Amino acid sequence: MINLFISMPMRGKTHKEIINTRYRAIARVKLKFPHEDITVINPLPFTSGERPLPVFCLADSLKRMTTADVIFFAKDWEIARGCRVEQFVACHYMPQILRMYESKQNHRKKEPFKCLTL
């Protein structure tokens, strides 16, 4: 079984766009691991109207990310602060975890993203 964490920008996205991004991520990971079951590590659920501080959401994401076997960085992850922090942590503190990327830039260059530095 593969535990999948999806790092994706969510600001300004509709519920449908978020769900479609998740499906694309799952499909890409399934292509790489066709004989494995995939469990998506879901973010902390919030009740309608609840607006926690962004740093609270980021801390929760980092905690949940530690249980992942694969971290998938969705399109435009490079422009979202939280995604950049997740990528930094994944590279520098969790190097054993497989990182996969969905980005136009990555597909054109045909090379993996380098780990971000401070």
Give the role of each language-model region.
Residues 1-118:
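Conserved catalytic or regulatory cores that recognize and/or transform ribose-phosphate-containing ligands
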